[in-house]
Amino acid sequence: MKWKIIADSGCDYRSLDNLAPDTEFVSVPLTIQVGETIYRDDAQLNIDQMMEEMYATTTASKSACPSPDDYMKSFEGADNIIVVTITGTLSGSYNSAEIAKKIYLEEHPNAKIHVIDSLSAGGEVDLLVRKLNHLVAEGLEFDQVVDAITTYQSKTKLLFVLAKVDNLVKNGRLSKLIGTVVGLLNIRMVGEASKTGTLELLQKARGQKKAIKAAFDELIKAGYNGGHITIAHRNNDKFIEQFSELVREKFANASIEVLPTSGLCSFYAEEGGLLMGYEI
């Protein structure tokens, strides 16, 4: 039986190391429109160029989800298919994958497909994809993998730290006043993905040092107890180094994986931003 683990580019992995036997990982890209340019969020994307252009334009940039046809093409050739999408509150990717599933199963009734709305982005999506690969490698049946990943998802969370909010302001999700204050006062926005998949603000911290402490405090408050952490970041090695030290002071054996953000996650996290998935 051939497996496919499929994720849209709300996941930061472009490829997966140590793939389970008879398993393929496929990234289905969203597109991001900046001014007149449309960027496809795949392995060839020059994220630095996209971000530079995004900050140079005064108009709102926007993303577009994969089409059902994009998903159907990614399903081809597998018996067992599991899809993970960015939260449905930010994108139509989940709905697109569900439509593709319905059509594909009519044409391939012996295939098995499960679509997961991560209710999240970045690091937490990465955690789910990583766990799926481990579950398949254990030799579990399709239904067992679905049950296990559903249970696992209930024990993962997303914490985000934003140093810039230009996109949120341009898209009308934050007022210009707040955007100006964040820039002038060196404010970091610390928040989480809620249980319904919305991004909620938890704290405003002034400066990197206070943001690191705020992020760690929120992790502990949410029930973190030394489990795996995946941090997707947009050019903020210093934060990761100091935050990792703080985590390992309390949890010496904590496993921390660090990834650069995908194009889509760079679009949301912006320069210096982080999207951190962790187990509770």
Describe the role of every protein-language-model region:
Residues 10-20, 24-26, 30-31, 37, ...:
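Mixed-charge interfacial surface used for oligomerization/domain docking
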Residues 78-83, 106-116, 258:
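Glycine/charged-rich beta-loop-alpha catalytic/anionic-binding loops adjacent to active sites
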Residues 1, 75-78, 222-225:
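Flexible, charged surface loops at secondary-structure boundaries
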Residues 3, 81-83, 227-229:
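Generic beta-sheet signal
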Residues 66-101, 105:
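Active-site cofactor/cluster-binding pocket
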Residues 6-7, 85-87, 116-117:
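Short beta-strand segments
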Residues 47-48, 68, 129, 142:
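Alpha-helix initiation and N-capping motif
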Residues 2-64, 70:
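N-terminal glycine-rich anion-binding loop in soluble enzyme alpha/beta folds
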